[in-house]
A protein has these predicted regions:
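Flexible glycine/acidic-rich beta-alpha junction loops that bind and position SAM and/or redox cofactors
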Residues: 24-28, 102-118, 149-160, 187-188, ...
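Acidic/histidine-enriched ion/cofactor-binding microenvironments in catalytic or ligand-binding pockets
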Residues: 14, 99-102, 121, 125-128, ...
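Short glycine/threonine-rich loop-to-helix capping motif typified by GTGT followed
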Residues: 75-82, 113-126, 157-169, 228-231
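Short acidic, glycine/serine/threonine-rich loops at helix termini
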Residues: 7-8, 26-33, 76-79, 115-119, ...
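Short, structured patches in soluble enzyme cores that scaffold and shape functional sites
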Residues: 20-22, 66-69, 108, 152, ...
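Charged (often Lys/Glu-rich) extended helix/loop segments that serve as interaction or gating elements
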Residues: 138, 143-273
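Single conserved hydrophobic/aromatic residue that forms the stacking wall/gate
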Residues: 271-274, 278-282
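Active-site-proximal beta-alpha core segment in soluble small-molecule metabolic enzymes
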Residues: 1-103, 112, 133
Length: 282
């Protein structure tokens, strides 16, 4: 799509990054994490080499490489393994194209544990693993000045936001349903990915989880469910439910389909210290 880029913006930027897709499956010690070969994104290695040569001839001076091989991996192995693959790739790109490679973007994000039984990633261990690969691969190749970028939105924000919603309906047919006043317009992940988000019934944190519910929104789509066959305390109309780990991919992925209006976003914070005034010095 180099011609398309050139036609769209009128030139080739001096700094440009290309996305790599290694194909196949991406595996770690705990099994297959994702299947890049099925992804519509990125270039093969041969395409990437050719693209760098063409872009260089068209005036690009500084290059970056990006890859996204798995999403929300709750393991400290992902980033070091991804870094190793990309570092080896840019050494080869440098040798075969002579391009000035300035940065690498390790994508996919440091994952967060959406289920209570999982341990969180250790960011220090991840950093040490990436640093080790950097020293082993890039430094000996004369690429010790390459910058590393990454994407930490979910890691920084995900665990620190909740979607608070009110139980407004109940239905007893072939399953037990609790309808709430939020819907997929407020949090899409369960509807589009089948993703798990932990749910707490506020005020009933210590009550036995002895009821099986589907917790649903009000969209005219059967996938609009925050929980399916979830063991929860008995929920009464008017109870408030906290849907956890909604600080990322929440409001930003929201929409107005079905005439839905997105919720407010209150922020809770504490002043640790007031700013100083001149009177503090007197």
């Amino acid at each position: 799509h180099i011609d398309f880029l050139e036609e769209t913006i009128g030139h080739i930027p001096e700094t440009i990054s290309c996305r790599y897709n290694p194909g196949g499956v991406f595996e770690l010690s705990n099994g297959i994490m994702d299947n890049p070969g099925d992804s519509k994104y990125g270039m093969t290695k041969d395409q990437l080499i050719e693209a760098f040569k063409i872009l260089k001839d068209k005036g690009a001076k500084h290059f970056g490489v990006h890859a996204f091989l798995a999403s929300n991996t709750v393991t400290n192995e992902y980033y070091p393994k991804l870094a190793g693959e990309l570092f080896e790739l840019i050494v080869e790109l440098k040798e075969k194209t002579g391009c000035d490679i300035r940065f690498v973007n390790l994508s996919g994000g440091v994952g967060i544990p959406y289920t209570p039984d999982k341990e969180p990633n250790d960011i220090a261990v991840i950093g040490e693993g990436v640093h080790k690969k950097f020293d082993e691969i890039l430094v000996p190749a004369g690429l010790g000045d390459v910058s590393i970028y990454t994407e930490m939105g979910r890691f920084m924000l995900g665990p620190y936001g909740c979607l608070v919603t009110k139980a407004i309906h109940e239905k007893h047919i072939y399953k037990e349903y609790i309808g709430v006043d939020a819907c997929a317009a407020n949090l899409m992940r369960p509807a589009i990915y089948g993703a798990y988000h932990h749910i707490t019934v506020l005020g009933k944190e210590n009550a036995p989880c002895d009821h099986v519910y589907d917790v649903t929104g009000s969209l005219c789509e059967n996938c609009d469910k925050f929980a399916v066959d979830r063991m929860l305390p008995k929920i009464d109309i008017g109870d408030y439910l906290a849907i956890h780990d909604a600080g990322a991919h929440g409001f930003s992925m929201g929409y107005n389909y079905n005439g839905k209006l997105r919720s407010a976003e209150p922020v809770s914070y504490t002043h640790l210290r007031a700013h100083e005034t001149r009177s503090n010095l007197v």
